[in-house]
Protein backbone atom coordinates (compact mmCIF):
# COMPACT_ATOMS: atom_id res chain seq x y z
CA UNK A 1 0.00 0.00 0.00
CA UNK A 2 1.37 3.40 -0.98
CA UNK A 3 0.61 6.29 1.36
CA UNK A 4 0.78 9.96 0.41
CA UNK A 5 1.83 11.81 3.54
CA UNK A 6 1.36 15.43 4.58
CA UNK A 7 4.88 16.47 3.57
CA UNK A 8 4.44 14.77 0.17
CA UNK A 9 6.93 12.07 1.15
CA UNK A 10 5.76 8.76 -0.26
CA UNK A 11 6.56 5.60 1.67
CA UNK A 12 5.97 2.00 0.68
CA UNK A 13 4.05 -0.09 3.21
CA UNK A 14 4.14 1.76 6.51
CA UNK A 15 3.77 -0.82 9.31
CA UNK A 16 0.05 -1.53 9.54
CA UNK A 17 0.06 -2.27 13.26
CA UNK A 18 1.15 1.31 13.94
CA UNK A 19 -1.26 2.85 11.48
CA UNK A 20 -0.44 5.13 8.57
CA UNK A 21 1.18 8.27 10.01
CA UNK A 22 -0.38 11.61 9.10
CA UNK A 23 2.93 13.40 9.19
CA UNK A 24 6.65 12.82 8.96
CA UNK A 25 9.47 13.57 11.36
CA UNK A 26 12.10 15.44 9.37
CA UNK A 27 15.81 15.78 10.06
CA UNK A 28 16.52 18.30 7.32
CA UNK A 29 20.27 18.63 7.86
CA UNK A 30 20.87 14.93 7.16
CA UNK A 31 17.96 14.63 4.71
CA UNK A 32 16.15 12.04 6.78
CA UNK A 33 12.38 11.58 6.82
CA UNK A 34 10.75 8.99 9.10
CA UNK A 35 7.15 8.24 10.14
CA UNK A 36 5.64 10.74 12.56
CA UNK A 37 5.28 8.20 15.36
CA UNK A 38 9.08 8.33 15.74
CA UNK A 39 11.17 11.12 17.15
CA UNK A 40 14.86 11.48 16.37
CA UNK A 41 17.25 11.22 19.31
CA UNK A 42 20.56 11.93 17.63
CA UNK A 43 22.62 11.64 14.48
CA UNK A 44 25.08 8.75 14.88
CA UNK A 45 27.26 8.94 11.81
CA UNK A 46 27.72 8.64 8.09
CA UNK A 47 29.55 5.90 6.21
CA UNK A 48 30.21 4.79 2.67
CA UNK A 49 26.76 3.26 2.29
CA UNK A 50 24.49 5.42 4.38
CA UNK A 51 23.55 7.68 7.24
CA UNK A 52 22.59 6.41 10.70
CA UNK A 53 20.56 8.06 13.45
CA UNK A 54 18.82 6.85 16.60
CA UNK A 55 15.07 7.24 17.09
CA UNK A 56 12.38 6.24 19.56
CA UNK A 57 8.61 5.89 19.52
CA UNK A 58 6.82 9.01 20.70
CA UNK A 59 4.96 8.70 23.96
CA UNK A 60 6.15 5.22 24.86
CA UNK A 61 7.68 4.41 28.22
CA UNK A 62 10.21 2.96 28.53
CA UNK A 63 11.32 4.37 25.20
CA UNK A 64 12.97 1.61 23.18
CA UNK A 65 15.65 3.10 20.97
CA UNK A 66 15.98 2.09 17.34
CA UNK A 67 18.78 2.62 14.84
CA UNK A 68 17.72 3.93 11.44
CA UNK A 69 20.11 3.48 8.53
CA UNK A 70 19.28 5.45 5.41
CA UNK A 71 20.91 4.29 2.18
CA UNK A 72 20.76 7.23 -0.22
CA UNK A 73 20.78 7.13 -4.02
CA UNK A 74 20.19 3.40 -3.84
CA UNK A 75 18.19 3.10 -7.06
CA UNK A 76 20.99 4.60 -9.14
CA UNK A 77 23.88 2.41 -7.98
CA UNK A 78 24.09 -1.27 -8.79
CA UNK A 79 26.44 -2.11 -5.93
CA UNK A 80 24.11 -0.49 -3.38
CA UNK A 81 21.11 -2.36 -4.74
CA UNK A 82 22.92 -5.71 -4.64
CA UNK A 83 24.24 -5.14 -1.13
CA UNK A 84 20.86 -4.01 0.16
CA UNK A 85 19.04 -6.99 -1.35
CA UNK A 86 21.59 -9.40 0.10
CA UNK A 87 21.47 -7.83 3.52
CA UNK A 88 17.67 -7.79 3.66
CA UNK A 89 17.37 -11.39 2.52
CA UNK A 90 19.98 -12.67 4.95
CA UNK A 91 18.68 -10.69 7.93
CA UNK A 92 15.17 -11.92 7.23
CA UNK A 93 16.46 -15.48 6.80
CA UNK A 94 18.41 -15.41 10.07
CA UNK A 95 15.88 -13.44 12.13
CA UNK A 96 15.33 -14.56 15.70
CA UNK A 97 18.85 -15.70 16.60
CA UNK A 98 20.04 -13.89 19.69
CA UNK A 99 23.55 -13.35 18.31
CA UNK A 100 22.42 -11.86 14.98
CA UNK A 101 21.13 -8.30 14.80
CA UNK A 102 17.36 -7.96 14.43
CA UNK A 103 15.72 -6.05 11.57
CA UNK A 104 12.62 -4.27 12.89
CA UNK A 105 11.17 -2.47 9.88
CA UNK A 106 11.87 -1.29 6.34
CA UNK A 107 10.70 1.66 4.31
CA UNK A 108 11.39 3.07 0.86
CA UNK A 109 11.00 6.83 0.63
CA UNK A 110 10.89 8.25 -2.88
CA UNK A 111 10.47 11.99 -2.31
CA UNK A 112 13.63 14.06 -2.78
CA UNK A 113 15.81 14.99 -0.90
CA UNK A 114 14.80 12.31 1.62
CA UNK A 115 14.69 9.44 -0.85
CA UNK A 116 16.38 6.18 0.01
CA UNK A 117 15.99 2.83 1.71
CA UNK A 118 15.42 3.14 5.47
CA UNK A 119 16.35 0.14 7.61
CA UNK A 120 15.10 0.11 11.21
CA UNK A 121 17.20 -2.12 13.49
CA UNK A 122 17.60 -2.66 17.19
CA UNK A 123 19.95 0.01 18.50
CA UNK A 124 23.00 -1.45 20.17
CA UNK A 125 25.33 0.75 22.16
CA UNK A 126 28.76 -0.33 20.98
CA UNK A 127 30.56 -2.42 18.45
CA UNK A 128 33.19 -4.92 19.54
CA UNK A 129 36.03 -2.79 18.16
CA UNK A 130 35.22 -0.06 20.69
CA UNK A 131 35.19 -2.63 23.49
CA UNK A 132 38.48 -4.25 22.48
CA UNK A 133 40.30 -0.97 21.93
CA UNK A 134 38.97 0.65 25.11
CA UNK A 135 40.78 0.85 28.44
CA UNK A 136 38.29 -1.57 30.00
CA UNK A 137 40.11 -4.56 31.47
CA UNK A 138 39.09 -7.83 29.83
CA UNK A 139 39.56 -11.02 31.80
CA UNK A 140 39.95 -14.33 30.00
CA UNK A 141 36.43 -15.16 31.12
CA UNK A 142 35.19 -12.09 29.22
CA UNK A 143 37.09 -13.24 26.14
CA UNK A 144 35.58 -16.72 26.39
CA UNK A 145 32.10 -15.29 26.81
CA UNK A 146 32.46 -12.96 23.83
CA UNK A 147 34.07 -15.55 21.56
CA UNK A 148 31.42 -18.12 22.39
CA UNK A 149 28.66 -15.75 21.31
CA UNK A 150 30.44 -14.99 18.03
CA UNK A 151 30.75 -18.71 17.32
CA UNK A 152 27.10 -19.35 18.22
CA UNK A 153 26.02 -16.75 15.68
CA UNK A 154 28.47 -18.07 13.11
CA UNK A 155 27.33 -21.66 13.66
CA UNK A 156 23.79 -20.57 12.79
CA UNK A 157 25.01 -18.76 9.66
CA UNK A 158 27.27 -21.58 8.47
CA UNK A 159 24.55 -24.18 9.07
CA UNK A 160 22.61 -22.50 6.25
CA UNK A 161 25.64 -22.78 3.94
CA UNK A 162 26.26 -19.05 4.11
CA UNK A 163 29.59 -17.27 4.51
CA UNK A 164 29.53 -13.85 6.16
CA UNK A 165 32.75 -12.77 4.37
CA UNK A 166 33.29 -9.61 6.41
CA UNK A 167 33.56 -10.66 10.04
CA UNK A 168 35.48 -8.09 12.08
CA UNK A 169 35.00 -6.37 15.46
CA UNK A 170 33.29 -3.43 13.76
CA UNK A 171 30.60 -5.76 12.40
CA UNK A 172 29.84 -7.33 15.78
CA UNK A 173 27.63 -5.21 18.03
CA UNK A 174 27.78 -5.29 21.83
CA UNK A 175 25.00 -4.36 24.24
CA UNK A 176 25.58 -2.86 27.67
CA UNK A 177 24.90 -6.34 29.08
CA UNK A 178 27.65 -7.87 26.96
CA UNK A 179 25.39 -9.56 24.41
CA UNK A 180 27.06 -9.76 20.98
CA UNK A 181 25.21 -9.63 17.67
CA UNK A 182 26.69 -10.15 14.22
CA UNK A 183 25.60 -7.51 11.70
CA UNK A 184 26.26 -6.24 8.16
CA UNK A 185 25.34 -9.03 5.76
CA UNK A 186 25.84 -6.90 2.66
CA UNK A 187 28.78 -9.04 1.53
CA UNK A 188 27.46 -12.42 2.71
CA UNK A 189 27.20 -15.25 0.21
CA UNK A 190 25.35 -18.55 -0.10
CA UNK A 191 27.57 -21.45 -1.12
CA UNK A 192 25.34 -24.55 -1.14
CA UNK A 193 26.67 -26.75 -3.96
CA UNK A 194 23.22 -27.90 -5.03
CA UNK A 195 22.18 -24.41 -6.06
CA UNK A 196 25.31 -23.97 -8.17
CA UNK A 197 24.55 -27.26 -9.94
CA UNK A 198 20.91 -26.36 -10.52
CA UNK A 199 21.89 -23.26 -12.47
CA UNK A 200 24.97 -24.69 -14.19
CA UNK A 201 27.12 -22.02 -12.61
CA UNK A 202 30.44 -22.19 -10.84
CA UNK A 203 31.31 -20.68 -7.53
CA UNK A 204 32.65 -17.18 -8.22
CA UNK A 205 36.03 -15.98 -7.12
CA UNK A 206 35.93 -13.75 -4.10
CA UNK A 207 35.80 -10.11 -5.10
CA UNK A 208 38.50 -7.68 -4.08
CA UNK A 209 36.29 -5.59 -1.83
CA UNK A 210 35.15 -8.55 0.27
CA UNK A 211 36.57 -8.89 3.76
CA UNK A 212 38.34 -6.02 5.44
CA UNK A 213 42.03 -6.55 4.70
CA UNK A 214 43.22 -7.05 8.28
CA UNK A 215 40.84 -9.98 8.74
CA UNK A 216 41.26 -11.45 5.26
CA UNK A 217 42.35 -15.09 5.06
CA UNK A 218 45.57 -15.92 3.14
CA UNK A 219 43.65 -17.71 0.38
CA UNK A 220 41.75 -14.50 -0.34
CA UNK A 221 45.03 -12.66 -0.74
CA UNK A 222 46.94 -15.29 -2.71
CA UNK A 223 44.51 -17.64 -4.43
CA UNK A 224 41.93 -17.55 -7.21
CA UNK A 225 40.36 -20.79 -6.03
CA UNK A 226 36.76 -20.96 -4.73
CA UNK A 227 36.55 -19.95 -1.09
CA UNK A 228 34.87 -21.73 1.80
CA UNK A 229 33.53 -21.15 5.30
CA UNK A 230 37.11 -21.25 6.54
CA UNK A 231 37.53 -17.58 5.54
CA UNK A 232 35.16 -16.72 8.40
CA UNK A 233 37.10 -19.01 10.73
CA UNK A 234 40.31 -17.12 9.95
CA UNK A 235 38.53 -13.86 10.80
CA UNK A 236 37.39 -15.34 14.13
CA UNK A 237 41.00 -16.31 14.86
CA UNK A 238 42.10 -12.74 14.16
CA UNK A 239 39.41 -11.44 16.50
CA UNK A 240 40.42 -13.87 19.26
CA UNK A 241 44.06 -12.76 18.98
CA UNK A 242 42.92 -9.14 18.97
CA UNK A 243 41.22 -9.64 22.34
CA UNK A 244 44.65 -10.34 23.82
CA UNK A 245 46.65 -7.82 21.78
CA UNK A 246 43.99 -5.09 22.18
CA UNK A 247 44.72 -4.15 18.57
CA UNK A 248 44.52 -5.94 15.19
CA UNK A 249 47.30 -8.49 14.86
CA UNK A 250 47.84 -8.24 11.08
CA UNK A 251 47.67 -4.61 9.95
CA UNK A 252 48.72 -4.54 6.31
CA UNK A 253 48.74 -1.32 4.28
CA UNK A 254 47.83 -3.22 1.11
CA UNK A 255 47.37 -6.83 0.04
CA UNK A 256 51.06 -7.68 -0.32
CA UNK A 257 51.98 -5.96 2.93
CA UNK A 258 49.15 -7.88 4.58
CA UNK A 259 50.69 -11.15 3.41
CA UNK A 260 54.06 -10.23 4.88
CA UNK A 261 52.43 -9.20 8.18
CA UNK A 262 51.00 -12.72 8.37
CA UNK A 263 54.33 -14.28 7.37
CA UNK A 264 56.14 -12.46 10.19
CA UNK A 265 54.00 -14.35 12.70
CA UNK A 266 53.02 -17.64 11.03
CA UNK A 267 56.32 -18.02 9.22
CA UNK A 268 56.98 -18.44 5.51
CA UNK A 269 54.48 -20.98 4.14
CA UNK A 270 55.73 -24.29 2.75
CA UNK A 271 56.05 -24.59 -1.01
CA UNK A 272 53.22 -27.13 -1.22
CA UNK A 273 50.86 -24.56 0.31
CA UNK A 274 52.03 -21.89 -2.13
CA UNK A 275 51.48 -24.30 -5.02
CA UNK A 276 48.02 -25.08 -3.67
CA UNK A 277 47.10 -21.38 -3.87
CA UNK A 278 47.61 -21.73 -7.62
CA UNK A 279 48.67 -18.21 -8.57
CA UNK A 280 51.83 -16.60 -9.87
CA UNK A 281 51.69 -14.20 -6.94
CA UNK A 282 51.84 -17.10 -4.47
CA UNK A 283 54.55 -18.92 -6.42
CA UNK A 284 56.72 -15.81 -6.64
CA UNK A 285 56.42 -15.41 -2.89
CA UNK A 286 58.43 -18.58 -2.39
CA UNK A 287 60.58 -18.25 -5.48
CA UNK A 288 61.85 -14.71 -4.88
CA UNK A 289 65.23 -15.00 -3.16
CA UNK A 290 64.95 -11.39 -1.99
CA UNK A 291 62.14 -12.36 0.37
CA UNK A 292 63.52 -13.30 3.79
CA UNK A 293 62.48 -16.66 5.21
CA UNK A 294 60.61 -16.24 8.48
CA UNK A 295 60.20 -18.83 11.20
CA UNK A 296 56.90 -19.14 12.99
CA UNK A 297 56.64 -17.17 16.24
CA UNK A 298 54.85 -19.20 18.93
CA UNK A 299 51.62 -17.48 19.97
CA UNK A 300 52.63 -18.20 23.56
CA UNK A 301 55.58 -15.81 23.03
CA UNK A 302 53.26 -13.12 21.73
CA UNK A 303 50.64 -13.62 24.47
CA UNK A 304 52.53 -15.11 27.47
CA UNK A 305 49.62 -14.22 29.75
CA UNK A 306 47.06 -16.24 27.74
CA UNK A 307 46.05 -19.71 28.87
CA UNK A 308 47.29 -22.84 27.14
CA UNK A 309 43.77 -23.49 25.82
CA UNK A 310 43.55 -19.99 24.34
CA UNK A 311 46.89 -20.37 22.57
CA UNK A 312 45.87 -23.76 21.21
CA UNK A 313 42.62 -22.35 19.83
CA UNK A 314 44.36 -19.40 18.16
CA UNK A 315 46.79 -21.81 16.52
CA UNK A 316 43.90 -23.99 15.37
CA UNK A 317 42.10 -21.08 13.72
CA UNK A 318 45.01 -19.24 12.09
CA UNK A 319 46.48 -21.78 9.67
CA UNK A 320 47.96 -21.01 6.25
CA UNK A 321 46.11 -24.05 4.92
CA UNK A 322 42.36 -23.52 5.17
CA UNK A 323 41.74 -27.28 5.37
CA UNK A 324 43.72 -27.42 8.63
CA UNK A 325 41.57 -24.83 10.40
CA UNK A 326 38.84 -25.94 12.76
CA UNK A 327 35.30 -25.63 11.48
CA UNK A 328 32.76 -23.73 13.57
CA UNK A 329 31.45 -26.86 15.33
CA UNK A 330 34.97 -27.89 16.31
CA UNK A 331 35.82 -24.37 17.47
CA UNK A 332 32.73 -24.10 19.64
CA UNK A 333 33.59 -27.48 21.20
CA UNK A 334 37.16 -26.45 22.04
CA UNK A 335 38.17 -26.83 25.72
CA UNK A 336 38.84 -23.07 25.89
CA UNK A 337 35.06 -22.51 25.89
CA UNK A 338 34.03 -25.27 28.32
CA UNK A 339 33.47 -22.76 31.12
CA UNK A 340 30.88 -20.73 29.19
CA UNK A 341 29.42 -23.24 26.76
CA UNK A 342 25.73 -24.22 26.75
CA UNK A 343 25.42 -27.03 24.18
CA UNK A 344 21.62 -27.05 24.43
CA UNK A 345 21.49 -23.40 23.35
CA UNK A 346 23.41 -23.60 20.07
CA UNK A 347 20.68 -23.82 17.41
CA UNK A 348 21.23 -24.33 13.71
CA UNK A 349 19.16 -22.75 10.97
CA UNK A 350 16.20 -25.06 10.39
CA UNK A 351 15.20 -23.41 7.10
CA UNK A 352 17.96 -25.35 5.40
CA UNK A 353 20.56 -23.98 3.00
CA UNK A 354 20.03 -20.44 1.79
CA UNK A 355 18.79 -20.32 -1.82
CA UNK A 356 20.81 -17.70 -3.69
CA UNK A 357 19.63 -18.62 -7.20
CA UNK A 358 17.63 -15.38 -7.37
CA UNK A 359 20.91 -13.54 -8.05
CA UNK A 360 21.30 -15.06 -11.52
CA UNK A 361 18.01 -13.48 -12.59
CA UNK A 362 18.87 -9.94 -11.46
CA UNK A 363 20.87 -8.97 -14.52
CA UNK A 364 19.71 -5.39 -14.99
CA UNK A 365 19.18 -2.26 -12.92
CA UNK A 366 15.43 -2.36 -13.49
CA UNK A 367 15.22 -5.94 -12.23
CA UNK A 368 17.31 -5.05 -9.18
CA UNK A 369 15.06 -2.07 -8.40
CA UNK A 370 11.87 -4.10 -8.77
CA UNK A 371 13.29 -6.93 -6.67
CA UNK A 372 14.24 -4.60 -3.81
CA UNK A 373 10.77 -3.04 -3.76
CA UNK A 374 9.23 -6.51 -3.71
CA UNK A 375 11.53 -7.61 -0.86
CA UNK A 376 10.46 -4.61 1.22
CA UNK A 377 6.79 -5.32 0.52
CA UNK A 378 7.20 -8.98 1.47
CA UNK A 379 9.02 -8.06 4.67
CA UNK A 380 6.27 -5.68 5.71
CA UNK A 381 3.57 -8.20 4.86
CA UNK A 382 5.27 -10.77 7.10
CA UNK A 383 5.69 -8.11 9.79
CA UNK A 384 1.99 -7.26 9.70
CA UNK A 385 1.01 -10.93 9.84
CA UNK A 386 3.26 -11.67 12.81
CA UNK A 387 1.85 -8.72 14.78
CA UNK A 388 -1.74 -9.98 14.55
Swiss-Prot record:
It catalyses: L-seryl-[protein] + ATP = O-phospho-L-seryl-[protein] + ADP + H(+); L-threonyl-[protein] + ATP = O-phospho-L-threonyl-[protein] + ADP + H(+). One of its GO terms (biological process) is ascospore wall assembly. Residues 38-337 form the Protein kinase domain. InterPro entries: Kinase-like_dom_sf, MAP_kinase, Prot_kinase_dom, Protein_kinase_ATP_BS, Ser/Thr_kinase_AS. Its cofactor is Mg(2+). Its EC number is 2.7.11.24. ATP binds at residues 44-52, 69. One of its GO terms (cellular component) is prospore membrane leading edge. SMART domains: S_TKc. Activated by tyrosine and threonine phosphorylation. GO terms for molecular function: ATP binding; MAP kinase activity; protein serine kinase activity. Dually phosphorylated on Thr-207 and Tyr-209, which activates the enzyme. A motif (TXY) lies at residues 207-209. The active site is at 166 (proton acceptor). It comes from the Eukaryota. Keywords: ATP-binding, Cell shape, Cell wall biogenesis/degradation, Kinase, Nucleotide-binding, Phosphoprotein, Serine/threonine-protein kinase, Sporulation, Transferase. Belongs to the protein kinase superfamily. CMGC Ser/Thr protein kinase family. MAP kinase subfamily. PANTHER family: MITOGEN-ACTIVATED PROTEIN KINASE. Required for spore wall assembly. Required for proper deposition of the two outer layers of the spore wall, the chitosan and dityrosine layers. Negatively regulates GSC2, an alternate catalytic subunit of the 1,3-beta-glucan synthase (GS). Participates in a developmentally regulated signal transduction pathway that coordinates cytodifferentiation events with the transcriptional program. The TXY motif contains the threonine and tyrosine residues whose phosphorylation activates the MAP kinases. Interacts with GSC2. This is Sporulation-specific mitogen-activated protein kinase SMK1. It comes from Saccharomyces cerevisiae (strain ATCC 204508 / S288c) (Baker's yeast). The gene is SMK1.
